[in-house]
Swiss-Prot record:
Substrate binds at residues 15, 42, 109, 132, 187, 292, 388. The modification N6-(pyridoxal phosphate)lysine is found at residue 249. Homodimer. This is LL-diaminopimelate aminotransferase. The lineage of its organism: Bacteria, Pseudomonadati, Spirochaetota, Spirochaetia, Leptospirales. It comes from Leptospira borgpetersenii serovar Hardjo-bovis (strain L550).
Length: 408
């Protein structure tokens, strides 16, 4: 009998979203006629926009011809998409990113989870609290986190509390962290950061030879001027940061799967002997060994997102979701809830009522209003007493959900 990776046994029982699904299923079986409105997991509800559909249809037909068939493509991504990403997502900000610094993948969740494989197993990890669970769980699996304590924290992780008191801006740790996870616009709190704050993180990373893993999957939802869209807007960030982007929420690709990671050539790591190593080269080796690339048809769809008509259609979808966010935010405020986020991000972070725990509030909403959200404690100990609602639902469902919650 083979031995197992015992680090998996250190994971908290049940990943957050499967636990939510389990509770909803139990409730539905007992209440089969109940209309449940789901504002929990951040899956989109609008269909793929016409420009993308048309591009994928054309690509599919192309694949049905002898001259247009594509088998295994370049693992890093087709040049047509890499060029579109570099020109539109970065060139528009005055940031120069080379095609060789972009790696197309099947999702930011995969990239955020896989990137840790190229770093030492004794690397010291820093995460905000609350935090997207994937950052923590993949490092638990790799053996970096130590044991979990009674307070829900792992002994070897550096936790950076993001609270109401500090504006949900995690403070820079006093100790040295090798790898720092940052997410803006933030999941789960829906808040954003400033260039001044990012400059401080870049300075810390340079001083401590740290690497910042910057998850910018929700960048397209930023509406206010002056809010940074990329960490590379900060001078020197290319020397210390990796950035993650996704088409999932931006263009509704949750079922198609397409994202990308940017690793600048300037970014270096070190061996135990002190030798500098290119992080871009390391990731390229890992990426091409374990991944065969995103399909040609999907990448043609992603390319269409950058066409003038594609941009217009996608902006309309984003406006739809952000209108939902405004409805949730204002509706909850009128109902007496303390709310955060929902302005530059599709998530609303609220304080639970009556000092209920996050899971007790989940059960109350499900039982009394048939509304499903996400317990804040599932994102970390500092999320206890908070709750996340997603703006990715249908307009009519969002309006009904807020009406139901208001009557509680």
């Amino acid at each position: 009998m083979a031995n197992i990776n015992e680090n998996y046994l250190k994971l908290k029982a049940g990943y957050l979203f499967p636990e939510i699904s389990k509770r909803v299923k139990t409730y539905s079986e007992k209440n089969p006629s109940a209309k449940i409105i789901r504002l929990g997991i951040g899956d989109v509800t609008l269909p793929i926009v016409p420009s993308v559909v048309d591009a994928m249809i054309a690509a599919s037909k192309e694949m049905g011809t002898a001259g247009g068939f594509h088998g295994y493509g370049p693992e890093q991504g087709y040049s047509f998409l890499l060029k579109s990403i570099a020109n539109n997502d970065y060139g528009s900000l005055g940031i120069k990113i080379d095609e060789s610094e972009i790696f197309v993948s099947d999702g930011s969740k995969c990239d955020c989870g896989n990137i840790q494989e190229i770093f030492s197993t004794d690397a010291k990890i820093a995460v905000s609290d609350p935090v997207y669970p994937v950052y923590v769980d993949t490092n638990v699996m790799a053996g970096r986190t130590g044991e979990i304590g009674a307070d829900g924290r792992y002994s070897n992780l550096i936790y950076m509390p993001a609270t109401k008191e500090n504006g949900f801006q995690p403070e820079i740790p006093k100790e040295k962290a090798d790898i720092i996870y940052l997410c803006y616009p933030n999941n789960p709190t829906g808040t954003v950061t400033t260039k001044k704050a990012l400059r401080a993180w870049v300075e810390y990373a340079k001083k401590n030879n740290s690497i910042i893993l910057y998850d910018s999957a929700y960048e397209a939802f930023i509406s206010e001027p002056g809010v940074p869209r990329s960490i590379y807007e900060v001078a020197g960030a290319k020397e210390v940061a990796i950035e993650f982007r996704s088409f999932s929420k931006t263009a509704g690709f949750t079922g198609l799967r397409c994202a990308y990671i940017v690793i600048p050539k300037e970014l270096k790591g070190r061996t135990r002997g002190g030798e500098e190593v290119s992080i871009n080269s390391l990731w390229s080796r890992r990426h091409t060994t374990k991944f065969n690339g995103v399909s040609y048809v999907t990448q043609k769809g992603a390319e269409a997102c950058y066409s003038p008509q594609g941009k217009k259609e996608i902006q309309a979808s984003i406006a739809y979701y952000m209108s939902n966010a405004a409805k949730i935010r204002e509706g909850l405020k009128k109902a007496g809830y303390e709310v955060f986020g929902g302005v530059n991000a599709p998530y609303i972070w609220l304080k639970t009522s009556d000092n209920l725990s996050s899971w007790d509030f989940f059960d109350r909403l499900l039982d009394k209003a048939q509304v499903v959200g996400t317990p804040g404690s599932g994102f970390g100990p500092a999320g206890e007493g908070y709750f996340r609602l997603s703006a990715f639902g249908k307009k009519e469902d969002v309006e009904e959900a807020i009406a139901r919650i208001s009557f509680l």
